[in-house]
């Protein structure tokens, strides 16, 4: 369904952002902005609205706009398919642990979280919280390698191979950028960002790269020294980095976790929003798309309703990585 709906939404968005009549009205207001006496906020809103139309391609000829809309629709379908493949591959991978050797090093909290009553085993998946916890805690090197490769090789073969999709997306983005007068998709994306250009982004990365690489080499040497006769591998990094942190700084993340319970973090975020922006959050009984969804009525300083804030804080197989709200 998602692969059908997203292209439809893209068509509707393009019908607005590429609309010649609507763009002409925005342009007339923008061209006369100096005489309108706009305040700072309205002036900024006008600037961003005009820019959005320009960057969508509204100023181009009907033929070019038609091509841009067609490319946008195709990209929308491909990016959705890419994300679905990744999600399905993430859901499909399961590492079942049944012996003491296989769960060596895992904390009681983590073992409790991954216990599967039906399978009578501890089951590790590829969602980030489960994956990273296992890679940090597990003493079983071969299982860390298996999980690492399971994560790394998602959507790289068979019907869910994202390689051809990524290539097609890149080609379409390059074609769209050329139609709009940009040297590349990267030039288009970075035009109004801090880096301004691909070269600006690369220059910044190189400033970090040299000292970062030197530090990484030192850390790798330290971790290699911790391996008795074995060669350091990528799947060792999380596990040995945590051991190194404990040795050097006596910093155990498990000891700080009680201070970062969901309730505490959420209360802190709401308090900060109230202090900075005068927002208040009141929990309301609204049915969500999942039983774990919690909704809040958001109001301003005067108590005026601003919107509904719905939180979906817990990882599950059907969610994309990072989709917490």
Predicted regions mapped to residue ranges:
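His/Asp/Glu-rich acidic catalytic environments and adjacent acidic regulatory segments
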Residues: 1-196, 211, 291-294
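Active-site-proximal, well-structured secondary-structure segments within enzyme catalytic domains
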Residues: 41, 45-46, 74-77, 84, ...
């Amino acid at each position: 369904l998602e692969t059908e709906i997203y292209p439809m939404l893209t068509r509707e968005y393009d019908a607005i952002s590429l609309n010649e009549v609507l763009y002409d009205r925005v342009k007339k207001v923008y061209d006369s902005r100096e005489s309108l006496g706009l305040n700072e906020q309205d002036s900024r809103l006008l600037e961003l609205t005009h820019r959005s139309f320009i960057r969508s391609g509204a100023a181009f000829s009907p033929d070019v706009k038609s091509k841009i809309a067609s490319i946008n629709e195709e990209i929308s379908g491909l990016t959705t398919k890419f994300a679905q493949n990744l999600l399905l591959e993430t859901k499909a991978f399961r590492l079942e642990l049944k012996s003491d050797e296989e769960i060596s090093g895992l904390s009681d909290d983590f073992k409790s979280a991954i216990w599967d009553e039906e399978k009578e085993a501890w089951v590790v998946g590829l969602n980030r919280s489960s994956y990273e916890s296992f890679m940090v805690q597990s003493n079983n090197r071969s299982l860390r390698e298996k999980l690492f490769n399971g994560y790394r090789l998602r959507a790289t073969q068979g019907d869910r191979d994202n390689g051809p999709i990524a290539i097609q997306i890149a080609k379409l983005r390059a074609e769209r950028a050329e139609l709009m007068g940009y040297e590349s998709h990267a030039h288009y994306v970075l035009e109004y960002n801090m880096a301004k250009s691909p070269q600006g982004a690369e220059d910044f990365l190189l400033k970090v790269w040299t000292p970062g690489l030197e530090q990484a080499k030192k850390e790798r040497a330290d971790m290699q020294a911790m391996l008795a006769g074995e060669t350091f591998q990528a799947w060792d990094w999380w596990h040995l980095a945590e051991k190194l942190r404990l040795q050097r700084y006596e910093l155990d993340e498990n000891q700080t976790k009680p201070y970062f319970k969901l309730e505490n973090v959420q209360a802190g975020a709401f308090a900060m929003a109230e202090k900075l922006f005068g927002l208040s959050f009141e929990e309301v009984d609204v049915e969500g798309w999942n039983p774990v969804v919690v909704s809040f009525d958001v109001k301003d300083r005067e108590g005026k309703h601003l919107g509904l804030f719905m939180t979906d804080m817990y990882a599950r197989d059907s969610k994309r990585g990072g989709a917490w709200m």
